[in-house]
Regions:
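Helix-to-beta-strand junctions that scaffold the AdoMet/dcAdoMet cofactor pocket
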Residues: 164-165, 178-180
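Conserved N-terminal segment of class I S-adenosyl-L-methionine
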Residues: 2-148, 154-157, 280-285, 292
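GHKL-family ATP-binding catalytic core of two-component histidine kinases
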Residues: 146-148, 165, 205
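S-adenosyl-L-methionine-dependent methyltransferase catalytic module, highlighting the catalytic core
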Residues: 167-169, 173, 183-293
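A short SAM/SAH-binding and catalytic strip from SAM-dependent methyltransferases
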Residues: 153-165
Length: 293
């Protein structure tokens, strides 16, 4: 059993009644709800639609496009700001996932090369969610988390909230599961093309993100540009060109080439992110909030 899985066992709960839950029998002894397992990974999820998505995830054959993607992985399409990098490194020092009494949960983040490098040395970091890439310790619905109340020291959520039909409920769940004094670090797009994974519902301004988390009790520690206006512009151009190509494998190859060709220009955001107007045209924002003691 991995270190992250051991830590998960300490804070796992039934998503229905939120009481302690054993993964061995897959049935909650309190409310008697039973949950399935997919590809050896436990899935305490009540939403039947999500359950069906998980089933198809493991039975469908890979397309040619997906096989090419496995052979030639896509580099990160956006560039993280200096401010967001410093913030992430700082909170990982404050809430070290390797500490025995510290529980750090990653929901969604980790697919990108940037996050793989950041999280590489933390084998006790718990990953949950419905990944379109990579692995998790447990499948989970962000709007009904299978975690004990007041159990998490630090929650990461990168580019997840825009894919949820009920973001208010998801942020409410983050507040429930985080310990008093604990932190949430979230990244949410502002200007970006529609992208399904499997659905895409909303975008937020920098003030909209703060308002969303404030409504559910969080105190803002910091907010800012995660990926700037040049990233937004180049990604829109890239998507406009790529989406005009109907054939999947060729589309992926064009996207790969454009990502590499345009990437150097994204460093211009290290300059433009310093200006106030950068917030008006940014690609992504980040938000750091703390649950009051």
């Amino acid at each position: 059993m991995s270190n992250s899985h051991k830590k998960l066992m300490d804070i796992l709960s039934c998503p229905t009644c939120h009481l302690a839950f054993s993964i061995k029998n897959k049935t909650c002894k309190h409310c008697e709800r039973s949950y399935p397992e997919y590809d050896g990974i436990f899935a305490p999820i009540n939403d039947l639609k999500i359950q069906e998505e998980l089933k198809t995830l493991f039975i469908k054959e890979k397309t040619l496009k997906e096989k090419i993607k496995d052979f030639i992985p896509m580099p990160d399409e956006r560039l993280w700001s200096q401010s967001s990098k410093k913030t992430i490194n700082k909170i990982l020092l404050e809430k070290n996932p390797q500490a025995s009494d510290c529980y750090v949960v990653n929901m969604g983040s980790g697919v990108e090369t940037f996050y793989k490098k950041v999280f590489r040395k933390y084998d006790s970091l718990i990953r949950i969610g419905i990944p379109h890439e990579g692995s998790v310790d447990v499948f989970a619905d962000a709007m009904q988390l299978p975690l004990k109340s007041n159990s998490v020291d630090l929650f990461f959520s990168s580019s997840v909230i825009e894919h949820l039909p009920d973001p208010e409920r998801a942020v409410s769940e983050l507040f429930r599961t985080i310990k008093p004094g604990g932190l949430v670090y979230a990244e949410i797009p502002f200007i970006g093309a529609y992208h399904m994974a499997p659905n895409d519902y909303q975008r937020y301004t920098i003030n909209g993100i703060e308002s969303l988390f404030n409504r559910h009790g969080f105190d803002m520690v910091k907010k800012g540009i995660c990926s700037g206006p040049i990233n937004a512009l180049l990604l829109l151009v890239q998507h406009a060109v790529v989406e005009a190509i109907p054939i999947g494998p060729i589309q992926y190859i064009f996207r790969l080439i454009l990502t590499w060709l345009l990437h150097p220009f994204k460093y211009l955001d290290y300059i433009f992110n310093r200006f106030k107007w950068g917030e008006y045209l940014a690609c992504n924002f980040y938000y750091l909030g703390r649950k009051p003691l």
